[in-house]
């Protein structure tokens, strides 16, 4: 299920959200969205039939660290007015992954031909928001300079089940000097709607993670000399829950290819 890493276009880094979505919708941009539309919230996406939506909502409510719900759509409605007045979820994500009966079947760049009147969209906060806050504080994130994203891993940490939905906690890893790790914990704790504080610091083996084995080969596994790995809950956890629950049909964003919204990152800070 590993997807090739798409080309990143740094010329869009200062684009506003509308320009980014238009580039995705009309110009066929299919790359990672990290660094695009600085200052604005990006969202993980999961789209399910309405018959599965209530159990999935309960799963999100029971697991707010990996599933910090920003909004859900009305049934059959491709808009998300809480995030922007001009989002069309069928076209505005760079890459989508489609699952049937829990199995990944294809990756596409447009889901208009897959859209149904019974679908409900869930949008979750994304760690790209707190990454901006870390950078604003002077904490370096090397992977961004290399046009990459944080490493993604399947841990052995559990989530709380809801109906058919359960999953191991998917995590992202960023490495820091001890001093910067302390500051990163303080900063990200201010952003519970984009995964909040870390779930683990230090030895990856304690949470069942091998840094050489990334989920879908996504992200940078590097831990620099004198640095320690720090792990955050990841918005790909719902994708794993879907794979275990095996609904007949589901659509998610592809890893690190998010929905760019009109919400300000600063609006999600709690203090």
Curated annotation (Swiss-Prot):
Keywords: Lyase. GO terms for molecular function: lyase activity. Belongs to the D-glutamate cyclase family. It is an enzyme of class 4 (lyase). It comes from the Bacteria. PANTHER family: D-GLUTAMATE CYCLASE, MITOCHONDRIAL. It comes from Afipia carboxidovorans (strain ATCC 49405 / DSM 1227 / KCTC 32145 / OM5) (Oligotropha carboxidovorans). This is Putative hydro-lyase OCAR_7359/OCA5_c07590. Pfam families: D-Glu_cyclase (PF07286). Its EC number is 4.2.1.-.
């Amino acid at each position: 299920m590993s997807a090739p890493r798409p080309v990143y276009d740094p010329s869009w880094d200062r684009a506003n959200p509308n320009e980014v979505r238009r580039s995705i919708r009309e110009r066929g941009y299919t790359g990672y969205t990290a660094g695009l539309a600085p200052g604005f919230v990006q969202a993980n996406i999961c789209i399910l039939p309405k018959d599965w939506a209530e159990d999935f909502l309960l799963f999100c409510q029971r697991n707010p660290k990996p599933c910090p719900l920003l909004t859900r759509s009305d049934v059959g409605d491709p808009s998300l007015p809480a995030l922007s007045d001009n989002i069309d979820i069928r076209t505005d994500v760079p890459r989508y992954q489609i699952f049937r009966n829990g199995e990944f079947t294809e990756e596409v760049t447009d889901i208009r031909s897959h859209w149904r009147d019974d679908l409900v969209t869930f949008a979750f906060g994304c760690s790209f928001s707190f990454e901006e806050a870390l950078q604003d504080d002077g904490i370096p994130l090397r992977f961004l300079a290399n046009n990459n994203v944080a490493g993604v891993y399947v841990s052995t940490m559990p989530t709380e089940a809801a109906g058919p939905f359960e999953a191991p906690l998917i995590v992202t890893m960023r490495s820091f000097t001890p001093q910067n790790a302390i500051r990163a914990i303080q900063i990200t704790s201010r952003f519970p709607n984009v995964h909040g504080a870390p779930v683990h610091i230090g030895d990856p083996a304690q949470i069942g993670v091998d840094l050489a084995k990334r989920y879908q080969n996504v992200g940078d596994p590097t831990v620099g000399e004198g640095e320690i790995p720090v792990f955050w809950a990841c918005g790909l956890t719902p994708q794993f829950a879907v794979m275990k629950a095996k609904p007949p049909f589901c659509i998610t964003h592809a890893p690190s290819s998010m929905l760019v919204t009109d919400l300000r990152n600063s609006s999600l800070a709690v203090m």
